[in-house]
UniProtKB/Swiss-Prot annotation:
UniProt key word Transferase: yes
Enzyme Commission identifier(s): 2.6.1.9
Protein family (similarity comment): Belongs to the class-II pyridoxal-phosphate-dependent aminotransferase family. Histidinol-phosphate aminotransferase subfamily.
Organism name: Paramagnetospirillum magneticum (strain ATCC 700264 / AMB-1)
Protein name: Histidinol-phosphate aminotransferase
UniProt xrefs under CDD domains: AAT_like (cd00609)
PANTHER family registered for this protein in UniProt: HISTIDINOL-PHOSPHATE AMINOTRANSFERASE, HISTIDINOL-PHOSPHATE AMINOTRANSFERASE 2
Pfam families registered for this protein in UniProt: Aminotran_1_2
Pathway info: Amino-acid biosynthesis; L-histidine biosynthesis; L-histidine from 5-phospho-alpha-D-ribose 1-diphosphate: step 7/9
């Protein structure tokens, strides 16, 4: 007798491994591996979490009505077309389950978020990548990779792990070049950090047709990664599909309470944005002065390329940083083995990273 077998393709999935948070034998850790908010969550979010603790025996609002209404009011959106999830990851997975399956293809750029391939394989679809140009998604290459089997195109904009982005005009050109039956999912997890006049999170494209979804998260700017909360803005038909497929109580009450408080604390969000606006160029400039190649980023992290010389490569740098208690993200899983991704931390953390890498390169 054989054991129950999963669907074909499931065992081909390489499990996602998040950024490490501990080093054996090291007490003080600088965790700069997961692009978490440098300043932590809003004090008002923490207070909301404490205040709702006595009600944790109650089921949450399955429709996340208060949060959806707040998001809709802020951005001028139809709240009935907003769907909340346990992180935007859950929503990406549900979209794959609902719109792709065996024999279908899910398309994304070569260095797109690893979860896209996992979500595709989990529903039996085939992940397909399109070449990038200068570590940036390329519209022509994406459109050239479309086949009759393409059902979903994921576009991380800005992109993790490269930190690069496509201007709004290019994203609009991408959407215009797609068949109407292909779902374009714009993963805008880092949109709050972007300070570029030619950038858009893509909401206007959702309003313009029936095949664009924008996903957002509370894990980055709002620093609520531990609670798992995200949202999607969709055409009416797609929102209806998501609400049929998602679990009825997919977002917990603690996440909803803290998320609403964080969302309404605009002053704290502005503080976090200002922090990143200062330290992102500072850290990028400091590492460039050490002779390292820093990919221009609009996010709360930078991708740093190291020489391939033995002892000076990314692997050696990672090992050296870990010896100092500094955890960054190795990029081998993205096909960028000569790079490390470093989250923008507190001012002290950023200075310690520079000091450690200065020692490593012998500057």
């Amino acid at each position: 007798m054989t054991a129950p077998a999963p669907r074909p393709g499931i065992m081909d999935i390489r499990p996602y491994v998040g950024g490490e948070s501990a080093i054996e034998g090291v007490d003080r850790i600088l965790k700069l591996s997961s692009n978490e908010g440098a300043l932590g969550p809003s004090p008002k979010a923490m207070e909301a979490l404490r205040a709702m603790a006595p009600e944790m025996h109650r089921y949450p609002d399955g429709g996340a009505e208060d949060l959806r209404k707040a998001i809709g009011a802020r951005f001028g959106l139809d709240a009935s077309r907003i769907v909340c999830g346990a992180g935007s990851d859950e929503l990406l997975g549900i979209l794959c389950r609902a719109y792709a399956g065996p024999g279908d293809e899910v398309l994304y750029s070569a260095h797109g978020f690893l979860m896209y391939a996992i979500a595709a394989k989990a529903c039996g679809a085939t992940p397909v990548t399109a070449p990038e140009v200068d570590l940036t998604a390329n519209v022509d290459n994406l459109l050239a990779a479309v086949t009759p089997r393409t059902k979903i195109l994921f576009l991380a904009n800005p992109n993790n792990p490269t930190g690069t982005y496509l201007p709004a005009t290019e994203v609009a050109r991408l959407r215009a070049g797609l068949r109407a039956d292909i779902l374009l999912v714009i993963d805008a997890a880092y949109t709050e950090f972007v300070s570029r006049n030619d950038y858009s999170g893509g909401i206007e494209l959702v309003e313009a047709g029936d095949n664009v979804v924008v996903c957002r998260t509370f894990s980055k700017m709002y620093a609520l990664g531990g609670l798992r909360l995200g949202w999607a803005y969709c055409p009416e038909n797609v929102a209806g599909v998501l609400n049929r497929v998602r679990n009825p109580f997919n977002v917990g009450a603690p996440a909803l309470a803290a998320g609403l408080a964080a969302f309404n604390d605009t002053a704290y969000a502005e503080l976090c944005k200002s922090h990143n606006d200062y330290w992102l160029p500072w850290l990028s400039g400091q590492l460039a002065e050490l002779g390292l190649t820093v990919v221009p980023s609009v996010c709360n992290f930078i991708l740093v390329r190291f020489p391939k010389d033995a002892g000076k490569d990314a692997g050696a740098a990672d090992k050296f940083l870990r010896s100092k208690g500094i955890i960054v993200r190795a990029m081998g899983g993205y096909g960028l083995g000569d790079c490390l991704r470093i989250t923008i931390g507190t001012g002290e953390e950023n200075q310690l990273v520079v000091a450690a890498l200065k020692e490593f390169v012998g500057a």
